[in-house]
Amino acid sequence: MSTATAQPAKKTPQKLTWLNIVGYGSGDLANNIGWRMMSMFLATYYIYIGIDPVVTANIFLFARFFQAVVYLLAGNYADRVKPNKNGKFRRLVVMFGVPMMVAITLMYTIPTDIDMALKITWAIVTYLLYQLLGALGGVPYGALLGAMTQDQNERQRLSSARMVGGALFGLIATFTLAPAINTVTDQAALAKLMLPVVAIFCLVGALIYVFLYKTTIEQIDVPEQPKVSFVDTLKAIVQNPALLILCFATGFYLIATCVGSIGPIIAKEVLANGADAGTLALITTLVTLINASIGVVASPFGPVIARYLGKKGGWYLGCALGIIGGVMFIFVGNVWLSLVALALNAIGAQFCGNYVWGMEGDTVEYYEWKTGKRTDGAAMAGLSFFRQMFGALTSWLGPAILAFTGYKAGMNVAQDPSVAENLRLAAGLVPLIGFVISAAIMYFYPVTEEKFKQIKAELAERHAAAEA
């Protein structure tokens, strides 16, 4: 006589509460403490404490390449961790997020009176530590969304909450540090400004990670994804011309955003050169605000534009706005119009960014239509890897521009009169070139809206025939 073993019924996932959604969104506020403090202020901080712009650029380049490798390893690590009764992603976020806050604080503790070699070593070690912990915590944070719910409306709410959380810290940092960073008079004063503020931010960030752990839930078993080797990733890119075009077009629009990391220096040396302290603080705040937040304001218009112009047309519009902004910044000397030019650059980049992941999905369908094979994982890995590589180059370019224009490191260092003119030219020309190349590459992108309709219809016929 055989006895059947009763299988426990699977628990029906509960609806997410507003606290679950707020808890998840708050996590990206904490994540952005590191990202925003790096992208908005770290290059300026390094250079103001005397680290040469070329050295600063190379630190950024090496660290971002390091981060790209760590992200690949972090994904494998997260897959191998076994869940307990409370899941696994939340505890990984806290496990690495809290130490990351310590690493961020340490980045801004470089003593001003030590040997330059020690300053550089301190900068490298603490920045790499931040990149390591940020990747190890960032991967499970992204995966947590899928483990919380399968409902598409709830997932959209979680994504929106994440965007709000990230943008919120950009605003906080802008109005806290931007007005003051260009008004301090020496390195000691800079340290007294940065360290207490950053330490408070990071303490709050650590508490936010604990809040996330307490308020989020993991109730969906995320199936193990097939491992994608580096060779598979390269094949998916090289054999898929649509994906290859998207990767390079994305890379060059990212390059067009490179001046954001040196925004406070652009404000001081170009837009408010010789101005009083109040005007300098105002201009620095506005430049930082534009780089940090105006793209988020423009983001909701992306789907509307795509509805009328298509994603490819929306990309062209973004590049056109960036090109206009670059030309304006080079030739228009008026401070307020220069700020408009920077805003056009930021809006243009956001419009391009709006379409990247949707177009990535289209390239998967295109490749299946051409070859009969689907490469979802490899395509995502390939695009992400390209973004990391071009992101490294973008991080390098900001400080490198300062070096190429003859800017001297340090605080209140008398700059050659040609520096302001050279900076204006470079800060307009480099983004302009990035947008021009991005638009030129996108011209060859084969998946228009009409073509995609044809691809979907033919794939549907193939799938139906295969199931018959």
Model-assigned labels for residue ranges:
Residues S2-A468:
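Membrane-embedded alpha-helical bundles of multi-pass transporters/translocases
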